[in-house]
């Protein structure tokens, strides 16, 4: 867990120790946060004007905790790229909105929706950052039906890759 490794690194430094393995883990955790966005950049020419569904804002299901949540860094990059972000999370929206108020942000915009289906409706691309049950309940066929372009980056391995491909989702 990123919070634990950062705390361990801090404590070691306070006592004059350098834990290289822990420091490496902290570095890897940091770069992993935007891995999905980086993968999407290899595929997309631009995010300007694209509708991006973001499913899950919290660090993990069952909490509204945003500390170390990959959604924070990725939404920032999407907004800077000019995307219209449709964000869904059953409990973390209030906390997330403190970082990104609804409406115009950076070069893009963000809107908070009440259902996964609302987020997916007409989306060009989808990012999954938290494995909420509400997200798991959506079928691959629903992604295909609702999205304008069914391109999904599943950061929590919620869905079976083969089942998604068979449904026509990239």
Model-derived regions, located:
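Structural/interface elements that position substrates and couple domains in central-metabolism enzymes
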Residues: 1-170
């Amino acid at each position: 867990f990123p919070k634990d490794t950062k705390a361990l690194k801090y404590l070691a430094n306070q006592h004059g120790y350098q834990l290289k393995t822990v420091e490496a883990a902290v570095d890897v955790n940091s770069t992993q946060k935007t891995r999905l966005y980086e993968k999407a950049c290899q595929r997309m020419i631009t995010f300007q004007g694209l509708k991006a569904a973001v499913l899950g804002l919290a660090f993990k299901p069952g909490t509204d905790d945003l500390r170390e949540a990959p959604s924070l860094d990725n939404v920032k990059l999407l907004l800077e790229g000019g995307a219209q972000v449709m964000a869904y999370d059953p409990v973390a929206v209030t906390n997330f909105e403190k970082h990104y108020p609804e409406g115009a942000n950076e070069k893009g915009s963000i809107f908070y929706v009440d259902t996964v289906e609302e987020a997916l409706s007409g989306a060009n691309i989808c990012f999954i950052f938290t494995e909420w049950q509400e997200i798991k309940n959506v079928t691959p066929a629903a992604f295909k039906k609702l999205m304008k372009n069914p391109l999904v980056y599943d950061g929590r391995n919620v869905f079976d890759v083969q089942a998604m491909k068979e449904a026509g989702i990239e």
